[in-house]
């Protein structure tokens, strides 16, 4: 039986490179010994695992980012606290194109990003392959905004995603460049149910579209649905968008674009891209995930189209707090497999490695991700399952006790749990294993030239939104003009000898019939609305709330049910409390939100 042992320091110093500020390759710092820093510059992906406050960011990910920037490789990172940006941007400013998207302070964000613009450019391209990319991006945005939630009816979110997708195609077909933004989608949703001529605005719009229109294919299910079903779909769709549209600063940031993802390249100048998100709530995690997904897909496509499958300058991606944003990067398992050969390396930062990956991606996909990891930094964690896994990976050693050879773990789960701050077990490709204490990043690298990053806003123009009502009016007018021109042409082509001496129709009689029909349709709509209100109303009883999240709950209920925040707060102060919802979808959304925030609610039959 083989007796395992830790890797000797001499083996590390012999087989790994030194990070001295002049190195032309980069990687995570794996050992600091006798004033010398050693790093791993292989293609292997990296995972950093450990509970909060153990030094994952200060000792590992920040040092990795600095080493990457000094070696003039490219860097992309999701930065929940803004630490990476604050600590490393001054280095990036020297040789890199620096892009910073700040979801914490959207009005002050140095850069702006329009999640629809890249797809729009592909959609309007003459290259048929680009149309496929556009469709894929639109679908990914839709399913990130409306994900399928386990143990709930998938119909509503899938229908809402289809509705959003149809509106996006409609915007691409009918809007101009400056109108392509999320604010336009929100305005289109608001206007879609406007009553007109006994119908509603979106149904009229769809009626003008050709049968092979992508917009019509996705919207016809919505426009032909019964009133109560349509109202519920609309409620679910608008509710997910409201978390963005309620912030004017955020909507402004998402309506401009200084990033221009489709034209990013790393050949002439490396890039340093920082995506800053709040660490005290997860409202913008979805957007950060979409942004990261668009970036990675672009660079993989760029490697394929321009560089024979491998980028000339390595891109290093740091995903801090992956458990939060991971759901919006649904393609991560495939990315882990595809990235390595494209010269893209990822570092995943988690608090409970395997269990968080399984929670976000499922067991099979989590196994794919773990199989792609070559370098592991294991700090102390609260998960005994994870600690036992690391203990088993290190292996057993043989010892002699009273003349007998027995085996015991080289390190136990308890010993791993007891590791102090900044101390980690390092595992590299199942070949090297050792425990080391890391200094803070500013002890590893000289930070004497540090200064705060430049935060100048690069965009000054205002965005405009698409007006669905005006578009429908123009399409109606165009249809009338074409009909009149056709009638006029037909009349001119007819020989006067054979023309009838009486009018083809009585204009006043026709107008009277049209008015009567409109009145009938409006009466039908009124009856349908009355029936919908009487049969569709639901009541939700809230019996318990999480007092630490009352403010969040007040905002949500106020927006969902259009009740003043003051009245909501008064109601919540005397539990149990009943709220009346206009649709089953609203009721289900409210119940799910209350439970998700630690409360209890149920539908009142």
Task: List PLM regions with ranges.
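P-loop NTPase motor domains
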Residues: 2-6, 10, 19-23, 29, ...
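Generic structural marker for isolated residues within well-ordered, non-membrane alpha-helices
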Residues: 45, 387, 554
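Short hydrophobic alpha-helical runs that function as membrane-insertion/retention elements
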Residues: 73-78, 98-102, 345-350, 376-380, ...
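Short, well-ordered alpha-helical microsegments
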Residues: 84-86, 387, 550, 587
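Conserved ATP-driven motor cores of ASCE-family P-loop NTPases powering translocation/secretion/packaging/pilus
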Residues: 336-429
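Short amphipathic beta-strand/extended segments with alternating polar/hydrophobic composition
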Residues: 434-440
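Short, amphipathic alpha-helical interaction segments embedded in low-complexity terminal/linker regions
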Residues: 498-605
